[in-house]
């Protein structure tokens, strides 16, 4: 469980983890209620805990207002819940994206770095170098293509080729590990971890 892993790691590092519950964007408050809460709560938390506070949200609708507030308060943002340079960053930082750069990760990573440097926020935010959902689609398609062309070991899932197709789709090394839950390891279920870049 992600939250428990975060708690355990914070305990190892001597950090305090503070949980906050925002209004559910699927509730009557809607996305605007969630975003308004974040816009009010992040500055309040920085006032209480200081600028060394790092924020993480578990819902996509939280990301844009959280990034805006982190820049304004000079605090920290670990990364979007669905790691991607395209989640929250462009609108929060006012990045204009030309039509020919809409899906260009390198362009977006550079644009984010520049905007954060202008705001004296270098080192305060990060994300994966490849968008998670695009990586899943592109890498999985490339794997299916390799399978159909006989470029795998013939099994339903050739873990080495799968890792290779994901890494190529990400433009960098992707760590792939089988999911183990309750003592059972699943051959067709994976945890993946892309390269993390701190801006």
Where do the language-model regions lie?
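A residue-level marker of the well-folded mature domains of exported/periplasmic proteins
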Residues: 1-199
